[in-house]
């Protein structure tokens, strides 16, 4: 698959051949769904907690005798039917993470890249370097390219001045190639890869 290469100023910088085994796969929404669920489950803090009956402060004495009162029998003031009582089978602190095979994760990333390529939402840049490191200069370049909600993926090292210029722009994310992931690719309208990123991603995902 051939793709045009642009510069940050919107000029043509030749073309690049993208591997069909990474950028030309059929789009499988089931895989993308599984990957997003897996990523978000790993991020979830899981700090929810309610007190069980053994954790509630209060007396352990029986509220009143078993028989002769005319009331339903009760064994503890800490039971859930009483005000201030325990929660039964409530949430506990736990990890929400679940397993997903490495092959599925690899295929999911390739599918996300392919989905962007097939939707015409993939741009390849010659390089992502900012000379000034100023946000206003980068905003002007993004306007020329017609980009708003965008994810930039560079090679192993992101240009320091580019990252500095980009960090205060809402809707713009910058990642090194090793940080490429399905969730961040899908949540932005456009995916921008540098030639260096394409090279490393193809090597890693072949």
Swiss-Prot record:
Region described as Disordered: 60-84
Biological-process GO terms, alphabetical: translation
Keywords, in A-Z order: Ribonucleoprotein, Ribosomal protein, RNA-binding, rRNA-binding
NADP is among the record's keywords: no
Feature: compositional bias, Basic residues: 64-76
Pfam families to which the protein is assigned, alphabetical: Ribosomal_L4
One Gene Ontology MF term: structural constituent of ribosome
Gene3D superfamilies: 3.40.1370.10
S-S pairs: none
Top-level taxon of origin: Bacteria
One GO CC term on file: ribosome
ATP-binding found in the keyword field: no
Function, in words: One of the primary rRNA binding proteins, this protein initially binds near the 5'-end of the 23S rRNA. It is important during the early stages of 50S assembly. It makes multiple contacts with different domains of the 23S rRNA in the assembled 50S subunit and ribosome. Forms part of the polypeptide exit tunnel.
Recorded family membership: Belongs to the universal ribosomal protein uL4 family.
Subunit relationships: Part of the 50S ribosomal subunit.
Protein name, entry field: Large ribosomal subunit protein uL4
Gene, per the UniProt record: rplD
